[in-house]
Amino acid sequence: MKPWDVEVFGGPVSIGACTHVIATPDKRVRLTVWSTLEGRGRMVIGKYCLLCPGVRISAGCEIVIGDSVMMAQGAFITDSDWHGVYDRSLSVGESIPVHIGRNVWIGDSAIVTKGVAIGENSIIGAGAVVVRDIPPNVIAAGNPAAVVRELDPDRPMKTRGDWLADPKELAAQFEEIDLDRMKNNTWLGWLRSLIHPVKGD
């Protein structure tokens, strides 16, 4: 990631430890706080979150995102209309805070609109448009988003926070993956790839 592929406009914007932001030149991550009222407007993103390419979060009053929340490519979260319904000259329009609970997963290109609260562990399906509160421990999908399934409360839930909590264990996992991916590599194979590369090298 290059810093210029992440745009932060306005403030305050608070991002917790171990949050990963993935951005590309064609799919920038945009975090915007823009309020017309003095002292209003803030964005809080918890620890261990994941923001994938193209994520946009736009706050006119308040957006609070809990720990271990994952936002897939192109997800959009906003707490404002950004223009008045009848007075289009209003630059922000009506704003109502958005609160997203711990360990929520927001799917590809999903939209979360003003005034919404999403309960912990819930999953928002790809392309969903969330216009009403979503309870905890459910899967919601569609436009407007509706609950399509409840998660099993008896099954243990592992979060990004759990995964990132032990750096030594995490490093060992990555080392194991690297070794598995390179197990068929040989010195002669490397030399051949330099002299006579073939597709798949």
State the predicted function of each range.
Residues M1-T78, G101-N103, E120, P136, ...:
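Domain-scale signature associated with acetyltransferase and cell-envelope carbohydrate enzymes
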Residues E38, L90-I100:
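Glycine-rich NAD(P)-binding loop of Rossmann-like domains
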Residues R56-G60, S109-S122, A128-R132:
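Beta-rich strand-turn-strand
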Residues D81-W82, R88-L90, E150-L151:
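Conserved catalytic-core motifs of eukaryotic protein kinase domains, centered on the activation segment
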Residues E94, A140, P156-K158:
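Glycine-rich, phosphate-binding/catalytic loops in enzymes
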Residues V98, G115-V116, N137:
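A short, glycine- and basic residue-enriched loop/turn
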Residues W105, I123, I139-A141:
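Short-chain dehydrogenase/reductase
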